[in-house]
């Protein structure tokens, strides 16, 4: 390996890294290690000591992404991911809320999509009647049917980060967690402007990282939403606004995905499994490796696996 760089960080960032590289994790972990991940031209090894080693041709670029990640001090007592000062009140399920959710972060092909939705408390019975629930429990046909009705019922803001721009931002040192934070904040900001002068009783974000880390990702942004903002994992079960956001995000993602398949001239699979590697290899043969950034998230391990299939 041509390069080796070691950085010192903390358990919060290492947990974010493990989540970021979840599709590239190696089954083998060295003694004293937390995880090892292999991405194109770089192997990342995180240790219990807080040290993280980057080895390979892209070691410097990969390490740079994490040297810019805000670091928070270690907490002596391990807390639940939902144990923080941003936890929603017990009554939130009956409140008028803006909810936001994202899809596409675990898919090799296709964009990242974030949607924020405002649901007035008086609309909750209607949303239940429409069948609004977590989009993971609905197939594409059900998503489409419910989403088409939701579009005329609730105010929303939808943002799509296409693959080329995603890869460009990632190469500039923005990890996926930061990109998600930027999109959530922007979608919420757009929606609040859209529904003004109406003010929601709160904003609920489907939690993908600790709230303090989320806000540190937004440190350089001019507009950051902080007033009555709550975070909860499985937010779609906490308030229907998040479930509605999840459905509209999935609806947008499916539409974008179908367009991408047409552009590729072949069906593209979702997810990040072996069938994705095979499809990516076929796509490279068909259109050339130069066009791959238009279709995929290059930092996924699937990139390297696809090229391996072509050897």
Curated annotation (Swiss-Prot):
Q: Name one GO cellular component term.
A: ribonuclease H2 complex
Keyword terms? Cytoplasm, Endonuclease, Hydrolase, Magnesium, Metal-binding, Nuclease
Residues engaged in binding a divalent metal cation? 101-102, 206
Top EC class of this enzyme: hydrolase
Domain named RNase H type-2: residues = 95-311
Main localization (coarse)? cytoplasm
Enzyme Commission (EC) number: 3.1.26.4
Question: What does the cofactor field's note say?
Answer: Manganese or magnesium. Binds 1 divalent metal ion per monomer in the absence of substrate. May bind a second metal ion after substrate binding.
Q: Which InterPro entries match?
A: RNase_HII/HIII, RNase_HII/HIII_dom, RNase_HIII, RNase_HIII_N, RNaseH-like_sf, RNaseH_sf, TBP_dom_sf
What reactions does this protein catalyze? Endonucleolytic cleavage to 5'-phosphomonoester
Q: Name where it's found.
A: Cytoplasm
User: According to its UniProt record, which cofactors does this protein need?
Assistant: Mn(2+); Mg(2+)
Origin superkingdom: Bacteria
Q: Name one GO biological process term.
A: DNA replication, removal of RNA primer
Biological role = Endonuclease that specifically degrades the RNA of RNA-DNA hybrids.
Similarity-based family: Belongs to the RNase HII family. RnhC subfamily.
The name this protein goes by in its record: Ribonuclease HIII
| Species of provenance | Bacillus anthracis
């Amino acid at each position: 390996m041509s390069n080796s760089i070691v950085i010192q960080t903390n358990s919060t960032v290492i947990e974010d890294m493990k989540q970021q590289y979840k599709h590239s994790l190696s089954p083998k972990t060295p003694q004293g290690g937390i995880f090892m991940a292999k991405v194109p031209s770089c192997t990342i090894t995180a240790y219990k000591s807080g040290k993280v080693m980057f080895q390979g041709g892209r070691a410097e670029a990969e390490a740079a992404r994490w040297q810019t990640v805000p670091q928070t001090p270690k907490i002596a007592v391990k807390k639940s991911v939902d144990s923080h000062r941003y936890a929603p009140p017990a009554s939130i399920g009956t409140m008028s809320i803006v909810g936001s959710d994202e899809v596409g972060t675990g898919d090799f092909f296709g964009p990242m999509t974030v949607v924020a939705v405002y649901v007035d408390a008086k609309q909750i019975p209607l949303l239940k009647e429409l069948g609004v629930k977590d989009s993971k429990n609905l197939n594409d046909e059900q998503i489409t049917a419910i989403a088409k009705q939701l579009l005329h019922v609730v105010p929303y803001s939808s943002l799509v980060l296409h693959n080329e721009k995603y890869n460009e931002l990632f190469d500039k040192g923005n990890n996926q967690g930061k990109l998600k934070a930027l999109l959530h904040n922007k979608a919420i900001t757009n929606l609040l402007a859209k529904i003004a002068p109406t003010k929601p009783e709160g904003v609920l974000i489907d939690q993908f990282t600790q709230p303090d880390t989320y806000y540190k990702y937004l440190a350089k942004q001019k507009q950051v939403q902080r007033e009555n903002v709550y975070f909860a994992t499985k937010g779609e079960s906490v308030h229907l606004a998040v479930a509605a956001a999840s459905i509209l995000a999935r609806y947008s993602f499916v539409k974008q995905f179908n367009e991408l398949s047409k552009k590729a001239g072949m069906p593209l699979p979702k997810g990040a499994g072996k069938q994705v590697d095979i499809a990516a290899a076929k796509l490279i043969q068909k259109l050339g490796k130069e066009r791959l950034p238009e279709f995929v998230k290059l930092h996924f391990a699937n990139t390297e696996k696809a090229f391996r299939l072509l050897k």
